[in-house]
């Protein structure tokens, strides 16, 4: 961003609010855009996102608006912090010369990567932001780290400068598919971990699930050109640990609710892993890949298996060596 210009943060949910606060903490003024004018007006007045991030006050450096053209006016790039299903509509309303930083951990409606979808619309400067980042902790200024990946090193460096502070380390990467898809797939594994919690399967089961889930992530990501180092980095293993174990995690909580026979919906908040499971399962079937944990979650969320049946299918797979080539 140019000196003194505000960083557009498009999306005033919990994560968008936390990123706007993080930018201000780094000395970067921010413009937080909310889709609903009434919500934006209330947020601007009370200076606290009581619906999505209660207890975190907006600093003076964060302005709030519902005017999208005004929010991005004069900006070099913007953070897009809306659920994946809302990204296409938001992209359609943005100037193509704007750099876009995609912060959702999901897929486009057609199952493609959001970065590919943005490039297909004519955006030449695209980045993705991902890591073990719970909004509740980032907003409070607790220590954390994240990764911004882009084929445009200047864009990645600019995002790093805008967000890096004593409480948030920002690393750069050129591995866009690895950083982007690690955040997508770990959500599904976290749903499975939550189901295990809801079924009271114990620590051994969770450790097994996360270890085999990481192997599943590695096979899937590397088949799409990701680097193995990324899989075991912040946006892969790091995000998996945070999402599969934390009480803040929507995906883990949704899986636990399903296992208990309750609704996985959480006050209107989007649970990316529930939608992504079906898209990833369809991709695996179409391309001849075996993603057993993804398949189990997809079958359960479609109502074709119960959580207990999902466990039986996973535990009943054929015997094999732990590290057999090509096997998850």
Curated annotation (Swiss-Prot):
Domain of life: Bacteria
EC number(s) from the headed UniProt entry: 1.1.1.94
Enzyme class per UniProt: oxidoreductase
Pfam family, one: NAD_Gly3P_dh_C
Catalytic activity: sn-glycerol 3-phosphate + NAD(+) = dihydroxyacetone phosphate + NADH + H(+); sn-glycerol 3-phosphate + NADP(+) = dihydroxyacetone phosphate + NADPH + H(+)
UniProt keyword list: Cytoplasm, Lipid biosynthesis, Lipid metabolism, NAD, NADP, Nucleotide-binding, Oxidoreductase, Phospholipid biosynthesis, Phospholipid metabolism
Active-site residues annotated for this sequence: 186 (proton acceptor)
Single GO cellular component term: cytosol
Record pathway: Membrane lipid metabolism; glycerophospholipid metabolism
Recorded family membership: Belongs to the NAD-dependent glycerol-3-phosphate dehydrogenase family.
Protein's UniProt name: Glycerol-3-phosphate dehydrogenase [NAD(P)+]
Lineage of the species this protein comes from: Bacteria, Thermotogati, Deinococcota, Deinococci, Deinococcales
């Amino acid at each position: 961003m140019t000196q003194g210009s505000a960083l557009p943060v498009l999306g005033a949910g919990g994560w968008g609010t936390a990123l706007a606060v993080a930018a201000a903490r780094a000395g970067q003024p921010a413009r937080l855009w909310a889709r609903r004018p009434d919500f934006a007006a209330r947020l601007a007045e009370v200076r606290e996102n009581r619906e999505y991030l209660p207890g975190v006050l907006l600093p003076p450096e964060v302005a709030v608006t519902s005017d999208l053209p005004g929010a991005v006016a004069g900006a070099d790039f913007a953070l897009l912090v809306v659920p994946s299903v809302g990204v296409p509509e938001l992209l359609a309303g943005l100037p193509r010369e704007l750099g876009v930083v995609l912060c959702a951990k999901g897929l486009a409606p057609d199952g493609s990567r959001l970065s590919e979808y943005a490039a297909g619309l004519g955006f030449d400067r695209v980045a993705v932001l991902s890591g073990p980042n719970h909004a509740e902790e980032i907003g409070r200024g607790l220590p954390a780290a994240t990764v911004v990946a882009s084929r445009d090193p200047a864009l990645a460096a600019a995002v790093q400068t805008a967000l890096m502070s004593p409480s948030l380390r920002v690393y750069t990467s050129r591995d866009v598919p690895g950083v982007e898809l690690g955040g997508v797939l770990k959500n599904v594994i976290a749903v499975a971990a939550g189901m295990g919690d809801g079924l009271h399967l114990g620590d051994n089961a969770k450790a097994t699930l996360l270890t085999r889930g990481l192997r599943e992530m590695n096979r899937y990501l590397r088949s799409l050109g990701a680097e193995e180092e990324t899989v075991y980095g912040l946006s892969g293993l790091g995000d998996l640990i945070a999402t599969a174990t934390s009480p803040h995690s929507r995906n883990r909580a949704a899986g636990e609710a399903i296992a208990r026979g309750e609704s996985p919906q959480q006050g209107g908040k989007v649970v990316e892993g529930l939608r992504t499971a079906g898209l990833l399962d369809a991709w695996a079937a179409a391309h001849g890949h075996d993603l057993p944990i993804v398949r189990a979650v997809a079958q359960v969320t479609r109502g074709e298996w119960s959580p207990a049946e999902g466990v039986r299918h996973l535990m009943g797979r054929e015997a094999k060596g732990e590290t057999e080539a090509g096997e998850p």
